[in-house]
Structures are given as C-alpha cells and as structure tokens.
C-alpha cells in the first residue's frame, strides 16, 4: 500500500469533508470570498495535557525540562510514524494516542478578547472580557493600554486553557494597514499608518500576549497576520482568496511589511500567518521570498517560530491561484516555501501523495511540526503542574475583567470630530431623545471575532441608568430606505431637550469576506438626521463602525452641533459614550484613518495597491492623498485648549552628519538605525477650563531625496493623562534614525542629506527643523527577490 493510501485510510474519520482530486466541482474562489472549510478545520476540541509523570512520554526527552525546547520537540516528532507526522500538520491535530500525546487545536482567536473558546452556557468560563475593536483602541494613542489589553487576554486565555477550553496559540494581532477605506476588516487593524501605528500596536500586543519580549516561558503564542499585502475581501467581486496584488518593492518595504519587521525583530513574535492573496504572481503561502528571505533571513524571525497558513490558503495555492498544478503540488509548494502548519486539511490529506511522488521529504514536514511543538514546550504544555501559568483560574478572569480596561480603552479611543460647545452637555439638560439603529445594540458593540461578554452596555442602557429622562425611538435601520419610523423619532425629539442620533455602519456592511463599494452613509440615516436638525434642538450625532463614512454634510450643517466617532466600543461602549457626552470624561482620541469624501471611492479601483498618486488615483493614506479630506488622519478635538511649546534653550543640536550617525556605538539596540536621532520634547499646558488627557502625533516631512515626496509621515505619538487646567507637563517623543529615512525604488531605507521638519499634530503647533549632512546612506538593505518555488 502506498503512503498516500495508508494516510488516506487513517484520515477517513479525521477528514470527513476532504475532497479527492478526482472531484471536478470546485468553488470558484476568484469570486467566492469564504473558504469552504471542512468540519475538522473549524472544530473546537476539549484540550488536555500530556502526562509527563506517568504517561508513555514521561521517560523521553520531551518531558525533560532541562533540555532545549527545540531538542525536546525534535525528540517527540522523531517518534512519530510518517502517518502520525502528517496527521499533525493541520490546525486540528489528533495528537498521537499511542504516545499519550493529546489532540491539539492551533486555531484560537484573540483579536480583542477570547474567541473560539469552549465557553460554558453559564457560570464559570461562560464569558471573557470583550474589548473595543483595535481601530478604536489605537485611536487612544496609548501604548500602555494596548499592552494591558493583551496581557489581560493572555491571562484569561491561560485560565481557560488550564481547564481545556482554549488553545495556547492565538491568531492575532491583525497588523495589516487600513489602506482602502472600503476594506471590511479595517476595523480589526490599528489604522492606515503601517510604519508607526501598526508597528507600535504589533509590539505592544505581541509582548502582552506572549508575556514579554521572547520570555523563557511563553504566556501564549501570538500570530502576526496577514503576511503580506492583504487588505481586501471581495471588492467588486475580487475575492481575497484569489487576489493577485501588484506591489512594487518600494511599497512592499515601505508600507506592507514594516509592521511585520517590528513583530519579528523587536517583539519576537513566535508565529506569523501567511495570507490568502498572491503578491506579484506568487501566493503568500508559497512565497519563499516572504517566508524565508524576508521573514527569517532579514527580519530575524525567532529560530523556532512557525508560519501558519490562513485557513485553507495552502489549498488556495492551487485553487484559485493555479500556482501549483494540483492540490498535492499546493501542499508541497507551501511546506517547501516555509508554511509550517496548515490551517485546513490540505497538508493532512495530500502530503502522503506528495511524499510518494517525491515532491516533499519527511524532513521538510518534520521541520514545521517541530517548530509548532517547540513553541508548545515553551508554553509549558509538557510541564504538568509545574508550568508557570498553570495556577491561573476563573478567579483571574473575573479579577482582570474588574480592572475595567475595556471601558478605559473605549473612553480613551472615542474621537470628537465636531463640537460647537454643545458638548459636554449642560447641567440644565434633563431629557434626551435617543434615536437611531446603533442606540439599542448588543453584540454589535463588539464588531467581529468576539465571544460572549460578561455584559453589554448599549447607549440606551447607559442613559436609562443615568439621571436623564429618556425618549427612545429606533428611527431607521442601518441600510433601510423606509421612513416608517421617522414620525416616532421626530415625536421623541420634539419632547426632549437634546437629540442624540446613533448610526453609521456595522458588520452587515463591513466584515470578513465583505467590503463596501462606497463610503457614504447607508440607507436613509442622513435624511432622518437632516429632519432632526430642523427642529431647533441641540443635535449630537454618534458615527459608529470601524470604517469611515463621508460625514461632510454633517460637518457643514450648523444645526448638527456635535459629531463623535465611536467605532466598535466593546462591552462598556454605551457607558463610555455617555461619559464623554456628559463630560464625566473628556475626549482625546484621534482618527487613525482618513475620512475621505464619497467620490474618493469611485476614482480608482481598490485593487490598486500603489499609494503614490498616478492616473486617476489621487494617492492613498494621509501620506500621499492629494485631495481634501473630510476629516484628516490625526483629527480629534478636546473639551479644553492646550498650548505646546519647546522647553529648550535654543542650543539643541539641529544638524547631524549621516556617516557619524551610522558609525556610532549603539548599546541596547540591535541595529544602529533604531537609535534615537533626537528626543522631541515639548511642554504641554492646559489653557482651558476642563481637565483632560492630551494626545499628540509627531509628523516628519522633507524634500530631501528623489521625488515624489510624501505629504508627511508619522514618526511618533504619545498620550498624557489627566492634565488639570493651567497645569503643564512635559512630553517626549523619541525620533529614531530609521524614522526619518525614506524608501528607495529597490526597497532600501535611505538617509538623504537635506532639510527636515518635525511638526506636532496636523495643526503644526510646534515645528522643529533639522538638517542631515554628508552622503546619502542605506540604513536598511532590502534583499533582491528570488523565489525558490516556481509556478507550475
């Protein structure tokens, strides 16, 4: 019997939905954006731990805590038969019963709380904290907050794992940049800035999840996704499963991968997910340039870090990309390129045939499985009750939820877009009309990738539990064109002191496998808002959802007094919105995306990956957009006023020689370009009457080096907590050498001699000029692309 037939026999029960290659009816994944996963792939299983005291493995090296993790994992895998080896290459692995190795599920989710956990129906382990979606959390510009959230998720995840209800690897964070305003999953990301925001988010989230920077005992394993060039779902019928994105080496280096460099080199992430799409003709999961040359050889991915495919993307190497000649070839191409574990069943079902046809070796398959189990060793999977985190219980879930960080993330991230002084509400306001499809929501507060929360506070809940008299009317639905609810809404508004409308978009319009085709307010929400604005009452609009919509009509309507963006604010979202509106908390969030005018979505195809303006493309992101945004990236108002000033004496160094910078000692930094060029220090004074946090973005610009030049780019950000009126505080934003480099056409990061500016926020409230002298120099060398795997 051939190896392929032997494995097929073993996997009959394991893979009930697997396809045979003789089957000629396949889903057209060039159009369909949802993979047809087998029941085995999506299964959640009851997890347990190997018995290293009395079980079959107890006398083997894998149970020897004094041995190196790699050696322990290699010793384990060497005991597998070939069939057992192949069986354990998928996300749902059956383990090896004869060795006492339990089944394991790689696929757990932790985007903003636990998902794909085995929650109970009630009582202990029936919920976990549900934080705001990442795009709202990033708008707080608070690195510590991101790390706190990830740390809590990891604590709760380990508590669930200790009772077999959650895995030790999580498919998070999503650190793709939110390039296209129509992308359905932009809500999952830290925004449109890749170099600074996505990289900072990656670092803080990964180190929070993993328990530090490459700790000896990992808390959980984070997975940086989706690598690389993934930022569309199904725009205009272009499926994410079949997209082939044309990206220059310049923009691949500059925009689509710097966050993955930071994840690998600095945060020491232990897992990376290759994406569905192809880039320049090569599917990401069969792209040896991505997975070996860049990730391992250039970015410094940890030695036993493993690459997981996105779910079914190894299969997609054949269908629909047709990079491989058949499914067997897709499995072989993916493992040889560097995809270690298949989220799916392609490896499990087709490695036997690939082995028989000498397309793959046992050593190549072993390499990936050893990497996975090496991480499980680091996670204490084989250490029994001696594992560092084995004592975490349900009490730790309850305790960490009580820290109320979910509320803090929501209230810090909320962005005040417009305000004429109506907010915070005057003490004299007694009655409020609450209107709109986002006012009485539950799970909608959570966005996507969520599990059950301990509670969900809608805006309506929060106001009903306050001292206000509430007049509620639904008004209209997100995408409705029916005006049946208008009269009730207008009636509620007329008998109230203040009108609050909550609407925008939700996951019926933006989601995984679903992009938008426009960026307008859907349905007849604007029509209802316009009628409400004619009543002569103060009107506050809450614009909800992850992606932006064109709110220019609300911005220009003087009868719309205030406009707030609230994202997907999580379990405490309604309370956070109430507290901002009433002034219990002051807003300080800033947009981490650009709000474009509606016509932007019609000017060029969303599949155009070039950020630089060309043809009908007016440029993408705040760095290159040549039009006039409705609200800029970085926009955000306060309830008070601030004054920023440079505290220096005028003697600070403003000229730097490039060669001197790159030849200086750099203790504490792996690379000289990570050294601070300077520290941008400003004094911030609250000149108003309201205590408030203060947030800042620091931008650089220059005309040094070759054209075209970006408008500006972000080099740093920070947040000061609760600055009282008439008080001052110092803020320091380090500016690294690399952050003022530009990317040349070959993808190299280059320092160019010339004049540079650093400007604080869009208002340019403080500007610092400096000069780089000497010869231009490469600070980061981008490798020449060479593929080890060729197309069939």
From Swiss-Prot:
Domain of life: Eukaryota
Sugar-bearing residue positions: 23, 87, 118, 142, 246, 326, 385, 404, 440, 477, 518, 679, 701
Chief location of this protein within or outside the cell: secreted
Catalytic activity: Hydrolysis of (1->4)-beta-D-xylans, to remove successive D-xylose residues from the non-reducing termini
Keyword Secreted: yes
Range of residues in the leader sequence: 1-20
GO molecular function: alpha-L-arabinofuranosidase activity; xylan 1,4-beta-xylosidase activity
UniProt GO cellular component terms: extracellular region
BP GO terms, sorted: arabinan catabolic process; xylan catabolic process
Gene3D superfamilies registered for this protein in UniProt: Glycoside hydrolase family 3 C-terminal domain, Glycoside hydrolase, family 3, N-terminal domain, Immunoglobulins
Enzyme Commission number(s) of this protein: 3.2.1.37
Subcellular locations according to the entry: Secreted
UniProt keyword terms in alphabetical order: Carbohydrate metabolism, Glycoprotein, Glycosidase, Hydrolase, Polysaccharide degradation, Secreted, Signal, Xylan degradation
Pathway noted in the entry: Glycan degradation; xylan degradation
Pfam families: Fn3-like (PF14310), Glyco_hydro_3 (PF00933), Glyco_hydro_3_C (PF01915)
Catalytic residues in the record: 310
Known function: Xylan 1,4-beta-xylosidase involved in the hydrolysis of xylan, a major structural heterogeneous polysaccharide found in plant biomass representing the second most abundant polysaccharide in the biosphere, after cellulose.
Family: Belongs to the glycosyl hydrolase 3 family.
PANTHER family, sorted: EXO-1,4-BETA-XYLOSIDASE XLND, SUGAR HYDROLASE-RELATED
Protein name, UniProt field: Probable exo-1,4-beta-xylosidase xlnD
Organism of this sequence: Aspergillus fumigatus (strain ATCC MYA-4609 / CBS 101355 / FGSC A1100 / Af293)
């Amino acid at each position: 019997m051939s190896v392929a037939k032997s494995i097929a026999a073993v996997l009959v029960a394991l893979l009930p939905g697997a396809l045979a290659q003789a089957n000629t009816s396949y889903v057209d994944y060039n159009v369909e954006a949802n993979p047809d996963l087998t029941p085995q792939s999506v299964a959640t299983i009851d997890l347990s731990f190997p018995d290293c005291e009395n079980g079959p493995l107890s006398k083997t090296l894998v149970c020897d805590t004094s041995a190196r993790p790699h050696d322990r994992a290699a010793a384990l895998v060497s005991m597998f038969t070939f069939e057992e080896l192949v069986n354990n290459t998928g996300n749902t692995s059956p383990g090896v019963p004869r060795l006492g190795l339990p089944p394991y599920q790689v696929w757990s989710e932790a985007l903003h709380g636990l998902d794909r956990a085995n929650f109970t129906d009630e009582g202990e382990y029936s919920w976990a904290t549900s934080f705001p979606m990442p795009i709202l959390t990033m708008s707080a510009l608070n690195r510590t907050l991101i790390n706190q959230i990830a740390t809590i998720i990891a604590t709760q995840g380990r508590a669930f794992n200790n009772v077999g209800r959650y895995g030790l690897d999580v498919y998070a964070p999503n650190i793709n940049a939110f390039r296209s305003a129509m992308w359905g999953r932009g809500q999952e990301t830290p925004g449109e800035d890749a170099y600074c925001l996505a990289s900072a988010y990656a670092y803080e989230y990964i180190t929070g999840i993993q328990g530090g920077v490459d700790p000896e005992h990992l808390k959980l394993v984070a997975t940086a996704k989706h690598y690389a060039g993934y930022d569309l779902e199904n725009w205009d019928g272009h499926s994410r499963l079949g997209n082939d994105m044309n990206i220059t080496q310049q923009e691949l280096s500059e925009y689509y991968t710097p966050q993955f460099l930071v994840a690998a080199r600095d945060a020491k992430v232990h897992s990376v997910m290759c994406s569905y799409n192809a880039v320049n003709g090569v599917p990401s999961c069969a792209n040896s340039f991505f997975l070996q040359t860049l990730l391992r050889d250039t970015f410094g991915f940890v030695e036993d870090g493993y690459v997981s495919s996105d779910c079914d993307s190894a299969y997609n190497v054949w269908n629909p990309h047709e990079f491989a000649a058949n499914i067997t070839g897709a499995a072989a191409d993916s493992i040889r390129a560097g995809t270690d574990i298949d989220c799916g069943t392609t490896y499990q079902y087709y490695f036997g045939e690939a082995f028989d046809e000498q397309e793959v070796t046992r050593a190549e398959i072993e390499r990936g499985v050893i990497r996975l189990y090496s991480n499980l060793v680091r996670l204490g999977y084989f250490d029994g009750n001696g594992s560092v985190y084995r004592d975490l219980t349900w009490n730790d879930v309850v305790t960490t939820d009580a820290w109320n960080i979910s509320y803090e993330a929501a209230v810090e991230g909320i962005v005040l877009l417009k305000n004429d002084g109506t907010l915070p509400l005057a003490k004299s306001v007694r009655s409020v009309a609450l209107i709109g499809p986002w006012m009485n929501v539950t799970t909608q507060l959570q966005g996507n990738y969520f599990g059950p929360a301990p509670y969900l506070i809608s805006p309506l809940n929060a106001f009903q539990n306050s001292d206000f008299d509430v007049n509620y009317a639904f008004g209209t639905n997100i995408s409705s064109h029916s005006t049946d609810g208008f009269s009730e809404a207008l009636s509620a508004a007329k008998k109230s002191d203040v009108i609050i409308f909550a609407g925008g978009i939700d996951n019926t319009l933006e989601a995984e496998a679903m992009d938008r085709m426009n960026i307008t307010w859907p349905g007849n929400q604007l029509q209802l808002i316009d009628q409400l604005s004619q009543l002569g009452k103060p009107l506050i609009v809450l614009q909800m959802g992850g992606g932006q919509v064109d709110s220019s009509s609300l911005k220009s309507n003087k009868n719309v007094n205030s406009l707030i963006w609230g994202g997907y604010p999580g379990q405490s979202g309604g309370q956070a919105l109430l507290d901002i509106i009433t002034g219990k908390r002051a807003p300080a969030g800033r947009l981490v995306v650009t709000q474009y005018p509606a016509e932007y979505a019609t000017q060029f195809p969303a599949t155009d990956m070039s950020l630089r303006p060309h043809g009908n493309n007016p440029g993408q992101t705040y760095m290159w957009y040549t039009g006039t945004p409705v609200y800029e990236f970085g926009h955000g108002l306060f309830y008070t006023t601030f004054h920023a000033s440079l505290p220096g004496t005028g003697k600070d160094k403003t000229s730097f020689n490039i060669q001197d910078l790159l030849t200086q000692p750099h203790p504490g930094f792996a690379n000289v370009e990570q050294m601070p060029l300077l520290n941008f220090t400003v004094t911030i004074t609250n000149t108003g009457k309201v205590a408030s946090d203060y947030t800042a973005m620091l931008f650089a610009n220059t005309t040094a080096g070759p054209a075209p030049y970006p408008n500006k780019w972000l080099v740093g950000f920070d947040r000061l907590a609760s600055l009282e009126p008439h008080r001052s505080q110092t803020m320091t934003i380090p500016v690294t050498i690399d952050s003022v480099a530009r990317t040349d056409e070959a993808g190299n990061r280059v320092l160019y001699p010339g004049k540079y500016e650093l400007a604080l926020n869009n208002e340019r409230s403080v500007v610092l000029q400096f000069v780089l002298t000497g010869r231009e120099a490469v600070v980061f060398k981008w490798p020449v692309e060479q593929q080890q795997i060729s197309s069939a």
